[in-house]
Amino acid sequence: MNHSHAAINHGPNRRKFLVTTAMAGAVLGIAPLTLMGSSHSQQTQKGETNMKTRKLGTMEVSELGAGCMSISSNYGPPADKAQGIATIRAAHAEGVTFFDTAEVYGPYTSELLVGEALEPIRNEVKIATKFGFNVEGDGAPLSTPAQIKKVAEASLKRLRTDHIDLFYQHRVDPKVPMEDVAGAVKELIQEGKVLHFGLSEAGVANIRRAHSVQRVTAIQSEYSFIERAPEHNGVLGVCAELGIGFVPWGPVGMGFLTGWMTPETRFDPKTDYRHKFPRFSPENIRANLPILDIVVKKAAEKGTTPVQISLAWLLSRRPFIVPIPGTRSLAHLSENHGARAVALTEADIRQMEAAFAPLTVHGESMDAANMALCERA
């Protein structure tokens, strides 16, 4: 995720849900997926992976990326280092070329792990990281040009690289004009330390302001079957207009769309931020079950899983969308990538949207403090 993402506890296993819905055996091996905007397949040293590519602006990446926050922070205790490295390298072996991290994840531990894991294959992958918080101070947004350049130098060292492929502003800093932010990143691009510029949870006005100074390659914001803000606030539209890619975080609704949550699910207040997020209260989980049911029914119909339907739905929305599901589990990694083989037809999408349209999403996905950092209006 971005900033203070919720931390999934390791209580219910999402595969228990698949068993109860008679879908446990139907994970991979489904009919080929054809999605507008996907290009040629990726190859690795292990051979053909069938992973297609998409364009974020002018940057070509695998159609599914890998969110690396949950491996080392925010989703319960950090994974064992060897496990984390193995998961990242397994993603690459399956064709993933786009890895997402941030200074604030840990802080620092995610970048360190990503840097070590990808160092032997650095020339085969694209790494995205983020600046924008006063990590050493009060944690508030901080995007002064001096801070941006300081973070860039530190991130380069942690990532064991001489360039950052995509450098996002993690959250808009209301105290620093967007033109100054874009100008600082432009200077880093001119120096060769950064290749592409991105924004996270920025609104249309700031996207345009940034793009007028330095081409914006990608916007990263929360987007999933249950979280539709980018469809309504103009962000997807401005991305299409300006040739900017879109990277959804929380592509399975912070775990809600996996299907394992119930109104009885409780989140550990010490390790899982969702305990304070309104959407994950018992009453709102119960109220939102009709939304989950749409995904569950389509998964049963297609002989696949709710996770794969959720990711396939995102891939079908726009040709410039590249979801970044995160996991520390090799089994879940393979399940995520199985979404590429799920064939959602136009009729499937219409059916899902018609079922969703009359429903109300209950509860914000984050608490008020986190929502205040996002330009979603």
Give the label of every model feature segment.
Residues 78-91, 144-158, 205-207:
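Short, acidic/polar
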Residues 176-359, 371-376:
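Beta/alpha (TIM)-barrel catalytic core signal, keyed to glycine-rich beta->alpha loops juxtaposed to Asp/Glu
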Residues 1-16, 39:
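N-terminal secretory signal peptides
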Residues 61-65, 98, 124-128, 163-166, ...:
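Structural preference for beta-strand elements that scaffold enzyme active sites
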Residues 33-65:
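C-terminal segment of N-terminal export signals and the immediately downstream linker at the start
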Residues 13-31:
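N-terminal export leaders
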Residues 57-75, 128-139:
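N-terminal small/glycine-rich loop or linker at the start of catalytic domains
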Residues 100-117, 171:
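Glycine-rich, proline-tolerant flexible connector loops at the mouths of alpha/beta enzymes
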